[in-house]
Amino acid sequence: MIILDGKKLSQKDTIFLKEKVNQFKIKPVFTIVQVGNLFSSNKYIKTKMDKALEIGVVSRLIKIPESISEKDLISIIEEESKISHGLIVQLPLPLQFDQSKILNSVPITKDIDGLSEKNSKNLYSGKSCIQPATARGIIDLIKEYNFTIKDKKVYVIGESNLVGKPIKELFKQAGAIVKSFNINTGIKGSEEADILIVAAGHPNLVKPENVKNNSIVIDVGINSIGENDKMIVTGDVDFSNVKTKVKAISPVPGGVGPMTVISLFKNLIEIFEKYLLDDN
């Protein structure tokens, strides 16, 4: 059984990106817009800021109080985009905001998360687009271990617009036979997948009976269980019991998470290189 080590691969990619950035006369500018002060968001933001520092890009954090109006928030995003090469809005947003509307205020040329509707439209129509970071990270992780995607049954548990659907689309474009499951209607049939990707947001949802022998399981879930100093992070897969049945599995933490972060910076560098070409 192989552990799909996203942390190890992301470090290899970090070295590659750092070497690229060192060759630039000016440095890419990466901006995070955060509304509120959610504890879990602060943790994820620190990870991204640390990675930016490691790679050598300029990082900026714009913290905004929850009391801001939607109109003013959009204005800030539009202004910050003008002085950034890549910008993300840290999710989740407070409930009073229209998440789609806020994400769509990020210009498509700066949308390194790949979550705006304009970028999604290009993705689903097969046009040139920024690959959504999580989906890109998963494909890169599977390819690193030389597993075949073409003609394989790739099933996705979870149908969210931000994660599940983009994952399904990218694997479809890579030549896989794709299928998705909505957890509200059950996951019966998931045990037929050659590659099972779980992005449901439900801890330990997938048990050994839900996976095929010698299959590949990718756990996208990040669930915090417990309180304060006793809090642990677990995925959507019952890792300790499923790992004995499969060919390869990604752990939580240390699997998809680091790959999502490094994919943001891959997208940033690609956007920045286009900017340099257009500027010449």
Curated annotation (Swiss-Prot):
Catalytic activity, reaction form: (6R)-5,10-methylene-5,6,7,8-tetrahydrofolate + NADP(+) = (6R)-5,10-methenyltetrahydrofolate + NADPH; (6R)-5,10-methenyltetrahydrofolate + H2O = (6R)-10-formyltetrahydrofolate + H(+)
GO cellular-component term (any): cytosol
Pathway(s) served: One-carbon metabolism; tetrahydrofolate interconversion
CDD domains: NAD_bind_m-THF_DH_Cyclohyd
Family in the record: Belongs to the tetrahydrofolate dehydrogenase/cyclohydrolase family.
This enzyme's EC code(s): 1.5.1.5, 3.5.4.9
Function: Catalyzes the oxidation of 5,10-methylenetetrahydrofolate to 5,10-methenyltetrahydrofolate and then the hydrolysis of 5,10-methenyltetrahydrofolate to 10-formyltetrahydrofolate.
GO molecular function, one term: methenyltetrahydrofolate cyclohydrolase activity
Residues that hold NADP(+) according to the record: 158-160, 183, 222
Subunit structure: Homodimer.
Keyword annotations from UniProtKB, A to Z: Amino-acid biosynthesis, Histidine biosynthesis, Hydrolase, Methionine biosynthesis, Multifunctional enzyme, NADP, One-carbon metabolism, Oxidoreductase, Purine biosynthesis
Gene: folD
Domain of life: Bacteria
Protein name: Bifunctional protein FolD
GO biological process: L-histidine biosynthetic process; methionine biosynthetic process; purine nucleotide biosynthetic process; tetrahydrofolate interconversion
